[in-house]
């Protein structure tokens, strides 16, 4: 189930994004990016619709994923 990111308080959204970024551990190439930069990137992706917040009833968790990978 999609969760509209706009419905979350700014603090909750920030915490969800930080948790996601810390879990992912993605390699950003030659130059390491700060947590703040990574959070900003994910927030931008949510705002422009490239990424979505998804609630998993099965796992009772919230995740962030590319819109193209989301299947209802």
Curated annotation (Swiss-Prot):
Disulfides per UniProt: none
Top-level taxon: Bacteria
InterPro entries the record matches: UPF0270 (IPR010648), YehU-like_sf (IPR036685)
Transmembrane segments: none
Pfam families membership: UPF0270
Family: Belongs to the UPF0270 family.
HAMAP family (UniProt xref): UPF0270
NCBIfam families hit by this protein: PRK04966.1
Name of the protein this chain belongs to: UPF0270 protein YheU
Annotated organism of origin: Escherichia coli O45:K1 (strain S88 / ExPEC)
Gene: yheU
């Amino acid at each position: 189930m999609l969760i509209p990111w706009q419905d979350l308080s700014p603090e909750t959204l920030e915490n969800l994004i930080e948790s996601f970024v810390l879990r992912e551990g993605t390699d950003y190439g030659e130059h390491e990016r700060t947590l703040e930069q990574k959070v900003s990137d994910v927030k931008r992706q949510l705002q422009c619709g490239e990424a979505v917040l998804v609630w998993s009833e099965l796992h009772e968790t919230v995740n962030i994923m590319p819109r193209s990978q989301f299947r209802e």
